[in-house]
């Protein structure tokens, strides 16, 4: 009887992407950051979902709701700090991943690289909007300074800034829309990750030697699944 993972329409996709995927035999720990980014994204979406259940995107109560999460919600302090420090870890892994791509010439895979650039900008936008949400002094300052950069655009700059703010200054409308975008963007990022992997699997990964590895491939599972799990544990 044929293995179900090779015949079932859905499991077949997973099988070709994570189990029977032919991978170069010599990729180093620098290739671990892709899977670590996937883990970070999952942690951010899960912790963010629970935080959103208790957060209020109103200028009068936003800061109080964050305090309430830390003081009154069961393990709210842990969820918040996982989300905040998870974001820092996300960017550490992201810069390592991009750095490896530059060093080992991954930019030659144009489609994969371009989707990666879009992912980088999307993650930066999400992080910026998340920084604004607690509505402390630094949140207000950050929102004002970064959005004001758009006022440097000739002719339409001022109008554009006021359009993003939803008024003549950073206020309730700004906070509400930033929360809405901060909530939806991670799901868009997850969809872009799928496209990123789709393009990567079209060409195959590069390797530290920089030469084609078609003659020397090994299955992704168990070799690289174990390597990735070791990366998660570390």
Swiss-Prot record:
It comes from Lepus alleni (Antelope jackrabbit). Component of the ubiquinol-cytochrome c reductase complex (complex III or cytochrome b-c1 complex) that is part of the mitochondrial respiratory chain. The b-c1 complex mediates electron transfer from ubiquinol to cytochrome c. Contributes to the generation of a proton gradient across the mitochondrial membrane that is then used for ATP synthesis. This is Cytochrome b. Its cofactor is heme b. Its main location: mitochondrion. CDD domains: Cytochrome_b_N. InterPro entries: Cyt_b/b6_C, Cyt_b/b6_N, Cytb/b6-like_sf, Cytochrome_b_N_euk/bac, Di-haem_cyt_TM. A ubiquinone binds at residue 201. GO terms for cellular component: mitochondrial inner membrane. Heme b b562 binds at residues 83, 182.
């Amino acid at each position: 009887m044929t293995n179900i993972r090779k015949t079932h329409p859905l499991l077949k996709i997973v099988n070709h992407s994570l189990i029977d995927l032919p991978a170069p035999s010599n990729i180093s720990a620098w290739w671990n950051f892709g899977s670590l980014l996937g883990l970070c994204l999952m942690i951010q979406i899960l912790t963010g979902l629970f935080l959103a259940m208790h957060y209020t995107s109103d200028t009068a109560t936003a800061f109080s709701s964050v305090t309430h999460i830390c003081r009154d919600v069961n393990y709210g302090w842990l969820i918040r700090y996982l989300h905040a420090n998870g974001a820092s870890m996300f960017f550490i892994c992201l810069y390592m991943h991009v750095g490896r791509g530059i060093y080992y010439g991954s930019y030659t895979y144009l489609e994969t690289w371009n989707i990666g650039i879009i992912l980088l900008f999307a993650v930066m936008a999400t992080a910026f909007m998340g920084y604004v949400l607690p509505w402390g002094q630094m949140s207000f300052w950050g929102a004002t300074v970064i959005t004001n950069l758009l006022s440097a655009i000739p002719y339409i700059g001022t109008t554009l800034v006021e359009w993003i703010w939803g008024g003549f200054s950073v206020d309730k409308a700004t906070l509400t829309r930033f929360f809405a975008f901060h909530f939806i963007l991670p799901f868009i990022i997850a969809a872009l990750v799928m496209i990123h992997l789709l393009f990567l699997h079209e060409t195959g990964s590069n390797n530290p030697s920089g030469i084609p590895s078609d003659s020397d491939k090994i299955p992704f599972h168990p070799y690289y699944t174990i390597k990735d799990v070791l990366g998660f544990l570390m």
